[in-house]
């Protein structure tokens, strides 16, 4: 992301277009670089550009532009555990969930999920290539590494079990099937003994999957300041989910759109006031 003389007040941004042709954009002393590549892309680009842990970058032979040990740290995601039930009658999904229309209606699948919102567990992002921005980075979220997250998952799975025991769920049981409580599961079934913490904890760990609510890597107060400027670097901001230490309980899209509009108006106001 940086090229040439870094401290001279001018920055070059190298990018490629859809045809693979490289271009160089020159940012003047009153301009800014706004990085909004998301919780995965923004810390990756900073590391590739030489902004990160000095020891880590040096181990990859990446020239250190600015030592910032928290880039790529505190990566988190809202973990999800779900059950999939095979049911014997056509089941109409929400239109928002339809990916394609199948020609066969022999089997219907119902999915019920529980989510651990605002996890305390976090991990890190590392580069898989020290030169290629298109190379997928290595990310570990360390789901349930904090005992509090695992405890919340156990409570959520038990809530799923309580719901499965209600009369309203009887219609989803598979006639003549002697499986777990009369239900046919696609994939792992709920633990047979919900009162056993160890069994439910094992279930949480073995069935966890992502909700694609990635955040962290460029946290406010650790990598960027309250105005989302990268601390120690002039004219560079990160404005996306990588700055969040916690996400809202639902899909973060609206929150991120709000952040973009808020920061856009704020930067325009700052520029008018500086003229």
Name each model feature, range by range.
Residues 232-248:
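Short FAD-binding loop at a beta-strand-to-alpha-helix junction that anchors the flavin cofactor
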Residues 17, 37-38, 49:
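Glycine-rich, N-terminal phosphate-binding loop of Rossmann-like dinucleotide-binding domains
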